[in-house]
Amino acid sequence: MIEADRLIHPQIIDREEAEAVDRAMRPKMLDEYTGQDDTRAQLKIFIEAAQKRGEALDHMLIYGPPGLGKTTLAMIVANEMGVNIKSTSGPVLEKAGDLAALLTNLEPNDVLFIDEIHRLSPVVEEILYPAMEDYQLDIMIGEGPAARSIKLDLPPFTLVGATTRAGALTSPLRARFGIPLRLEFYNVKDLSSIVARSAKVMALEIDDEGAVEIARRSRGTPRIANRLLRRVRDFAEVKHSGDVTKVIAEAALDMLDVDAEGFDYMDRKLLLAIIDKFMGGPVGLDNLAAAIGEERETIEDVLEPFLIQQGFIQRTPRGRIATPRAYNHFNIIKPDA
């Protein structure tokens, strides 16, 4: 697994960090939400239409790399609809009764948010199908020959599922989501706006160039941008006057070993393994995972997406290949084929 202290890990490092983001930095309404313009425009229409009809919003699947705002969007949906949200995650729902307890406590049009929905157990998933389609819950009462099935009516509700691995969902579950939304990595302009907004919430003075520098090294991910902003603030308060400029942001992030592309030692280790150990590739995922001491799922879900999106790695049928841009990043001359 990825080391817990990896600063640019796009997943939540600890629950305290998540709660701090929840309280202060997360936008509450769509108008406050920055980036993902197409997704935001679609959601605005879907929400307004559901409100006009007085109905629950259709079930929604939000997918994409970690740290892009899937949980935030689920909360915004509940706020925009003026309803409550109950949150859980796939691994937590071990038994059918766990899901039944949540569903039977929903009010009309409430939002049920299930993070990591691709990790639902088959038993729980089977219970979810009639709940999503017919707002009914099929549960078994008793055991053995005396066991019987009863149907409970549920109020209309919106299931919002979030996943980093949409392909891991079963086809029957995926087909029951009427609104699929894919979140993309953020551009520097949108990320710098997020950094500036977060700095304002933190009562931190930051100039435009400082915000851009943090955004540029945040791997297109708001969660990483906010995490780096907090560490840059620490540096600015101890080493300087407390205000953040480009020079201060550069010094702080260099000290934290986050380079100009947003890479840390794990990214560099991955790229250099392909270049040095496997002569630029192609290399299979299992061999690459063994070479850098990581799990293949970590490489696929956390390390690779940004490197591929930025053009440092290519996936081919034969394996991963380091691109010319990867060689240039390390000032290595690519040997002739």
Curated annotation (Swiss-Prot):
A single cellular component GO annotation: cytoplasm
Enzyme class name: hydrolase
Stretches for region Large ATPase domain (RuvB-L): 4-186
InterPro entries in UniProt: AAA+_ATPase, AAA_lid_4, DNA_helicase_Holl-junc_RuvB, P-loop_NTPase, RuvB-like_N, RuvB_C, WH-like_DNA-bd_sf, WH_DNA-bd_sf
MF (Gene Ontology): ATP binding; ATP hydrolysis activity; four-way junction DNA binding; four-way junction helicase activity
Listed EC numbers: 3.6.4.-
Positions contributing to DNA binding: R296, R315, R320
Annotated spans, Small ATPAse domain (RuvB-S): 187-257
GO biological process, one term: DNA repair
Keyword Disulfide bond: no
Residue numbers spanned by region Head domain (RuvB-H): 260-337
Xref: Pfam families: AAA_lid_4, RuvB_C, RuvB_N
Catalytic activity from the UniProt record: ATP + H2O = ADP + phosphate + H(+)
Binding sites annotated in the UniProt record for Mg(2+): T71
Main location: cytoplasm
Keywords: ATP-binding, Cytoplasm, DNA damage, DNA recombination, DNA repair, DNA-binding, Hydrolase, Nucleotide-binding
Binding site for ATP: R26, G67, K70, T71, T72, E133, D134, Y135, R176, Y186, R223
Subcellular location: Cytoplasm
UniProt subunit comment: Homohexamer. Forms an RuvA(8)-RuvB(12)-Holliday junction (HJ) complex. HJ DNA is sandwiched between 2 RuvA tetramers; dsDNA enters through RuvA and exits via RuvB. An RuvB hexamer assembles on each DNA strand where it exits the tetramer. Each RuvB hexamer is contacted by two RuvA subunits (via domain III) on 2 adjacent RuvB subunits; this complex drives branch migration. In the full resolvosome a probable DNA-RuvA(4)-RuvB(12)-RuvC(2) complex forms which resolves the HJ.
Recorded family membership: Belongs to the RuvB family.
Function as written in the Swiss-Prot or TrEMBL entry: The RuvA-RuvB-RuvC complex processes Holliday junction (HJ) DNA during genetic recombination and DNA repair, while the RuvA-RuvB complex plays an important role in the rescue of blocked DNA replication forks via replication fork reversal (RFR). RuvA specifically binds to HJ cruciform DNA, conferring on it an open structure. The RuvB hexamer acts as an ATP-dependent pump, pulling dsDNA into and through the RuvAB complex. RuvB forms 2 homohexamers on either side of HJ DNA bound by 1 or 2 RuvA tetramers; 4 subunits per hexamer contact DNA at a time.
Domain comment as written in the entry: Has 3 domains, the large (RuvB-L) and small ATPase (RuvB-S) domains and the C-terminal head (RuvB-H) domain. The head domain binds DNA, while the ATPase domains jointly bind ATP, ADP or are empty depending on the state of the subunit in the translocation cycle. During a single DNA translocation step the structure of each domain remains the same, but their relative positions change.
Protein name: Holliday junction branch migration complex subunit RuvB
Gene that specifies this protein: ruvB
